[in-house]
């Protein structure tokens, strides 16, 4: 569905973990935190925390939505 997305993401952000790549893939597909939490079998708040940490790690400014950034990768 998104050929090369994870490869481009890993190239742009080499320190990204497997868990973070999975979260990025779910966000790129347009899934909500609640949907992701169901797939990962974790609490929705845990997904929100992971999103905040991911934003910091990828150095995404507060003006840009995480999902919008991932669509540009």
Which residue stretches match the model-derived regions?
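Cytosolic nucleotide-binding catalytic cores of signal-transduction proteins
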Residues: 2-73
